[in-house]
Amino acid sequence: MKLWKKVVLGFLSVLLVVVAGVCAYGIKMYSDANSTINGIYQSVNRKSNKGATANIDAQEPFSVLLMGIDTGDLGRTEQGRSDTTMVVTINPKENKSTMISLDRDILTDIVGNDTQDKLNHAYAFGGAEMAINTVQELLDIPIHHYVSINMKGLKDLIDAVGGIEVDNTIGEFTLDGITVPAGKIKLDGTTGLAYARMRHEDPEGDVGRQRRQREVVEKIVRKVMSFDGVSKYRKILDAVEANVKTDLTWDDMMDIQSKYLSAFKTIDSEQLQGYSATIDDIYYQVLDPNSLYKTQTTLRKQLGLKEHASEREKDLAFYNQFSYAVTDTALIGESGDSSANSSTSSSSTADTSAGQTEYNGNTQQAAEGAYDPNTYVDPNAYTDPNAYADPNTYVDPNAPQY
């Protein structure tokens, strides 16, 4: 699990802890926390017909797009890119949440920019709005809410809780001019960020870095949940306010804290990524259609939406519009046992005004002597010019000529 996944989840934990804490520690904290949440609120316009609303007060399943933005520290002041992109679906009725991590280099359509590019460029081109619209189209689900966090947030939060203590078993190292001593040490925000980011000097490489990242976020959350953390709540709120943007309201967060906690008992985590490809000397991740479809289906089910139609189901629905009753057809957008078996070839018959028509797998055959005006003609099909033509065969003068 990479740094930003840990940071994003850590910040979500902090938000929920703050909301829970205000209920126990008085009106002043309640007022300050309410003000902070109002300060980080930023609505976006969604350009999608996938449905952008979910009633959290009524405990409806909902989705959140989580983004870790690579700006705000190390001299980076531009809008930045979403270095980490995750989609979390939360379903309190099933007591379950699903978290899908999206590789930053996924090649996809950037909605609103009329181009194909890396997924993380959507935020760079159009902020949270373009990122949301792009992910909605990619995953074929509505994105009900979002939370974005910039790089400086980790540093500020470590400072806000008064630092964290770790045991640096790697030995002293320097990253971007910041030296981290060996042994049991107390880290401030600057050294804590370096400790979480360093990879090349760790004998375990990225595995070791992931372990340190997990350690840092766990230490932060533990400090926030402690009495010491509560006493520093104002600094914690300031760190959140300076580094987080979301379209979740204060009431939404109160409802999540009180009505959705059961949904966090089970969290299924998956990674959506494809195969590596270099296109015009640029590295991309190209998604496998089957893996993408599986992820789409998982998320739609978690949100209580109808199952996404497979290509097989789309083909069957195409034939159904011409009055061919196919028993294994699953209409587009519907789910059920029929869709589960749609990959197998089945045979069924239907009466039409023109005669008996049989559909078997992907072929159609009319009963002998019967003419069906709805018969599909493939304009690209090969016709043998030397084949025998029956002079008594009926030819429909209105049939399209190819």
At which residue positions do the language-model features occur?
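Sec-exported extracytoplasmic/periplasmic mature domains
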Residues: 92, 107, 111, 124, ...
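Entry/capping segment at the start of metal-dependent catalytic domains
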Residues: 3-95, 288-292, 296
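Soluble non-cytosolic domains of exported or imported proteins
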Residues: 81-82, 113, 122-129, 148-152, ...
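C-terminal solvent-exposed extensions
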Residues: 51-52, 247-372, 376-378, 384, ...
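Second-shell loop/turn segments in exported
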Residues: 73-76, 116-125, 140-145, 200-207, ...
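Extracytoplasmic
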Residues: 59-62, 79-85, 94-102, 114, ...
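Flexible, polar/acidic helix-loop-strand segments at domain edges
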Residues: 55-58, 159-235, 359, 388, ...
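Amphipathic, coiled-coil-like alpha-helical scaffolding segments used for oligomerization/assembly
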Residues: 120-179, 247-249
